[in-house]
Amino acid sequence: MKKIALILSLVLMLAACGAQPAETTAPAAATAPEGTCAELVEKLYENVPVELALMTETTETSLSDAEMFAYITGLQSNEGVADVAVSMPMMGSQAYHVVLVRAESGEKAAELAQYLFDNSDMARWVCVQATEKQAVVCGDLAFFVMLDPQYGVTTDQLVEGFTTVCGGAVDAVIK
């Protein structure tokens, strides 16, 4: 009887050790929404839970004028950029700047988001300075915002609104 129990336990141990591990899957990458960058920024503003205390203007930025592109977006090159829109105050020195870039790939979007986060001048305005900044990657989109929250909105609120535009999931948030 002891031999049967020993053999049975040995067989069970071998079966347990030889079992395949459960398959794990990486979370699915976020899918960027359809539309131009300017249209997506407008959708963002529909989702922001507070009304901006700024008169902002969203403009599509030309990829052909390299100097203006760099000045408006903060990017040094339009390499790998398919579309871009910028939203900022129409007048005055108010620390508020949103950049949305559709890149040629998700990898390029992540690279652009990190570049904007690392290299944007938070004191680019006369007499004012942004105190918050964040960047987000959603599929082939790179979203960047820097601002002074005294204008009635925070970067967290805008990132939350952008996440909603992206269907509730993003690939990365850089703080």
Q: Whereabouts are the PLM-identified features?
A:
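A short, solvent-exposed beta-edge/loop patch
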Residues: 90, 127-174
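Bacterial lipoprotein signal-peptidase II cleavage site
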Residues: 18-25
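A short acidic-to-branched-hydrophobic micro-motif
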Residues: 95-105
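C-terminal motif of bacterial Sec signal peptides marking the signal peptidase cleavage site
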Residues: 12-16
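An anionic, turn-rich surface loop/hairpin at beta-sheet edges
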Residues: 113-134
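Surface-exposed, low-hydrophobicity interaction/linker segments
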Residues: 33-89, 109, 115
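Short, conserved charged micro-motifs
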Residues: 106-113, 152-156
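Positively charged n-region of N-terminal signal peptides that target proteins for export
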Residues: 1-8
